[in-house]
Regions:
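Basic, polyanion-binding surface patches
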Residues: 1-162
Length: 162
C-alpha cells in the first residue's frame, strides 16, 4: 500500500497477477486497507495463499471480521488501523512500449478511518507504537518499524517560514 494523494486521501496497492481481491474490488467498487502489525504478520502472510475461488481468507488465516461504517466490506478486527475505501481507479500496468504486464494497480479514496485510540497521543497517530510491518524488496523480506529508528526532517519550504 502507498499514499498517492492527501486531499482527498487516495491510497493504492499493486497486485502481481489477477487475484480475487482485485476482481472483488472492481465488482463492488469498495475495499478496506488493514494495517499489518508485527503481531499480525503471520496471519497476513497466510492471506496470500492461493485459495479456491470463494474460500474465506479471513477464516483460513484465523482472522475475525468487523463491520465497516461506510463501505460494505468487512475489515480485519485484529488490525488497529483500517481505511475504508471507494475505488477510484484500477489499471493494468504496461511496459514503456505499451505492452501489458501481469500487474494491476488499484487506487481508492479513503472514506472512513478506524484507529485504535491507544495509538494516538494528543490526537496524533504514533506509527512506531503500532509496530507496523512493511515489505522490503523481496518475496520473503519484511521489516517492522520501531521508535529507535525514527528521525525527523523538516521540509525546506517549512524551514523558510520559520
Amino acid at each position: 500500500f502507498n499514499c498517492f494523494n492527501y486531499h482527498p486521501p487516495i491510497i493504492g496497492f499493486a497486485s502481481s497477477g489477477w487475484k480475487d481481491s482485485v476482481q472483488n474490488i472492481i465488482e463492488t467498487g469498495e475495499f478496506v486497507w488493514n494495517l499489518t502489525t508485527l503481531e499480525l504478520a503471520t496471519a497476513m502472510n497466510e492471506t496470500s495463499a492461493s485459495l479456491p475461488h470463494g474460500e474465506d481468507e479471513f477464516f483460513a488465516a484465523g482472522l475475525s471480521k468487523a463491520d465497516s461504517r461506510i463501505v460494505n466490506v468487512p475489515r480485519v478486527a485484529q488490525s488497529p488501523v483500517n481505511f475504508e475505501c471507494r475505488l477510484s481507479q484500477s489499471l493494468q500496468l504496461t511496459t514503456a512500449d505499451g505492452s501489458p504486464v501481469d500487474t494491476w494497480l488499484v487506487l481508492g479514496e479513503v472514506v472512513g478511518i478506524h484507529i485504535d485510540e491507544t495509538l494516538l497521543e494528543d490526537g496524533i497517530y504514533q506509527t512506531a507504537k503500532a509496530k507496523p510491518v512493511l515489505r522490503a524488496g523481496g518475496p520473503t523480506a519484511y521489516y517492522s518499524i520501531s521508535e529507535t529508528h525514527r528521525f525527523d526532517l523538516v521540509r525546506p519550504d517549512a524551514r523558510a517560514k520559520r
